[in-house]
Amino acid sequence: MHRGRFATLVIVALAVTMTAPAGALAPQPPAQHADADRACSFPVTEPDASNTAITLDSEPERVVTLNPSAAQTMWELGDRDAVVGVSQFGTYLPTASQRTVVSGGQPSQTNVEAVVGLDPDLVLAPNTVRNTTVTRLRSAGITVFQFRAATSIDGVVEKTATIGRLTGNCAAAAATTAEMRDRVAAIADAVPDTDSARPRVYYHLGDGYTAGPNTFIGAAIEAAGGHNIAADVNTTSSYPQLSEEVIVSQDPDVVVTGVSADRLDATASALVAPSSVVRNTTAYATGNVVAVNTNHINQPAPRIVEPMARMANAFHNTTINTTLDAQPSATTTATSTAPPTDAADGTAPGFGVAAAVCALAGAALVARR
């Protein structure tokens, strides 16, 4: 169905809704779960990060995802066939390489002409896509929903539910978010709730970069029963670069690093470069280097609960199931390292969150979201 026959864009003034602080999931009223079980209804209107109310008159049949987390969510909801375009780092999902790749380069840039050529009914865009890109797409008559940055696990759950509502997958989204909440609750029950029992954790992105406490990655570390050492550093950046001196002085008990799926069982010496300051920490000396799937830890999408469970098991010797049902088999593509940058045009909508840092596996974190 052509977008012009069903999608309208209503621009209104909206108050910016701030995301909840980083942390585990907040309790939800029972009524919300009951509503989530209902079938989707159209038209549907949702406010996005650009202070725009997006209205879809009927269920979109052609969807483009400009970041891999949105693609992962569509796959998780069982609606991969509706996706006609993906970002360059979304091709790890099974059959995703058969879609048109609509971004490229380092840092990743959206090919507006390619997106328009796909004639999508809906484009799902991250907060880090350039505002000028969103404007160009909307000027071409494309319906674009731009997400706020998820800074908590609750934010990731809500993003999943929002994608479900926008794409007509409410029942699947309800099942997925319920499983996410169940997994987070199981982790909370399994790990100690006292600060003294929390190991000090450094999330190693490479070159000193790490995830701050006001990010969904920082929230995942805390929910897994760890204490993020970045919370003890005086910085306002969401993804600060710590000096070697700071990392050594913080002396983490555990180092967490994102790797490709085939390296999850690698040894500490294989995970940490010989020249890395991480080798001067207690974590490395004791072999407490925890590998997690980089596509899952770095993307605010349903699979975030898998590295959370893996971290909890490593931090506290628990035995929590580390996989969701119907896990997609992933392929891994090597990419070159990109330096960290801010939001593409310096004005991430609504919140101004830092947009990109380099991942240890070699891809820009912003593009991998």
Swiss-Prot record:
Pfam families tied to this protein: Peripla_BP_2, PGF-CTERM
- Region annotation (Disordered) maps to 322-343
Q: Where is the signal peptide?
A: 1-24
Record-linked SUPFAM superfamilies: Helical backbone' metal receptor
InterPro entries reported for this sequence: ABC_Transporter_SBP, ABC_transptr_periplasmic_BD, Peripla_PGF_1, Vit_B12_bind_prot
Question: Does the record's keyword annotation contain Manganese?
Answer: no
Superkingdom, natural source = Archaea
Chain intervals with Low complexity compositional bias? 328-343
Q: Which cysteines are joined by disulfide bonds?
A: none
Query: Would the keyword Signal be found if you checked this record's keyword annotation?
Result: yes
Q: Which UniProt keywords apply?
A: Signal, Transport
Any single GO BP term: cellular response to iron ion
Domain Fe/B12 periplasmic-binding span(s) in chain numbering? 62-319
Q: What does this protein do?
A: Required for corrinoid utilization. Probably part of the ABC transporter complex BtuCDF involved in cobalamin (vitamin B12) import. Probably binds cobalamin and delivers it to the surface of BtuC.
Q: What does the annotation say about its assembly with partners?
A: The complex is composed of two ATP-binding proteins (BtuD), two transmembrane proteins (BtuC) and a solute-binding protein (BtuF).
> What is the protein's given name?
Cobalamin-binding protein
Q: Per the UniProt entry, what species is this protein from, by scientific name?
A: Halobacterium salinarum (strain ATCC 29341 / DSM 671 / R1)
Q: Which gene encodes it?
A: btuF
